[in-house]
Amino acid sequence: MATLRYFIRPLLTATLAASATLPAFAFEDDRLTIWMGDNKGQQGIQLLADQFLEETGIEVEVVFPDNLTDRFQQAAGSGQGPDIVIWAHDRMGEWAQSGLLKQVAPSDSFRESFYDFTWEAALWNGETYGYPISVESLGLIYNKALVDTPPESFAELMQLDKTLSQEGKKAILFDYSEPYYGWTLLAANGGYPFKRTDAGYDVTDIGVNNEGAVQGAELLVELIESDVIPRGTDYSIMDNRFNKGEVATMISGPWAWPNLERSGIDYGVALLPKVGDERAKPMFGVMTAMISSASPNDFLAVEFLENYLLSEEGMRTFNSDGSLGAVAHIDYQAELADNPNIAATLENAEVGMPMPNIPEMGAFWAAMEPALQNIGSGRQSPQEALDAAARRMRQ
């Protein structure tokens, strides 16, 4: 990795500091502070910070604060906080709109090392505000003891349920009234929260009640009314029954894998099933490294990110505990794809869409949850419920 000793004076004393306590807010020249969540890559990023210190003389403090998003917004809004914040891309638009993030301009050769769709997640208003690290997506998790080959469509799952029901088991469960999960059906044939354009998202163009979205919602009604998915199924019911070996498939993500391994379930991950002729489409998240607009050390931040953290070697170190899952770096992902579950996670993201990273998504979540609840309970027809959701989003 490149060294900066020829350019930057070494610090007289420099140590790696990693803490879960309250973060320091003041910036210091020639010293980097990174805030990130504590659930992925914690050990690996500390190793990279150590290496950066050894090779450049620049201290890197890695902090894992509670309530990171609120604290970053407060600190950065007053010109303080970390130089680099690592978080899911969905907060990027809000922070960029508030002037809290710097645009980044990686070279074409650097960009080519990462999947194009992960760079799309790092865009706001057509400009790049972060570096993609890893990808998290829903998939169809299946119990190999109950199904040899994962079903390709919901039609196949409905047929499978007729057989499994005779044994007291189910073909599929998922938390249909939670928009993150239920939306996958509505997106299959063209539903969208806000229309994606080259310049970002057109918040006046809402597609939650278009023909494709209604088609997905009508399938959901059919699944519930035929008792393929029992009315009232939520995440805890799904997770509990799947871990007991009572369910052949569920729609969930990598966060469910550790519990399955503890339960001794022999599981696989596949593409989400088709709604008609089209795959159900997840909204995927991308863990992203962003640079604070208040940082006086943006040159150092780019050096650490591009030549250390996000190099192939750096990604391997960052992921030394295996917690990143699917990654945005093409060559390193090819290595990880020996694990078919990690490969399937990336494949689901490739057919899905990045979760829109704009503040208006709050209106989407708030409108879609009651809409899906009303569809699931039968209080409203799919068209009525989705029309109401669209009206609420426009308010």
Regions found by a protein language model. Give the residues of each.
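Hinge/lid segment of periplasmic solute-binding proteins
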Residues: 89-139, 149, 154-158, 185, ...
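Long, aromatic- and glycine/proline-rich binding clefts that accommodate carbohydrate-like moieties
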Residues: 270, 319-367
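Extracytoplasmic/periplasmic substrate-recognition and gating elements
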Residues: 33, 50, 55, 126, ...
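Short helix-initiation/N-cap motifs at beta->coil->alpha
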Residues: 64-72, 90, 156, 230-244
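Conserved C-terminal helix/tail region of periplasmic/extracytoplasmic solute-binding proteins
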Residues: 31, 348-395
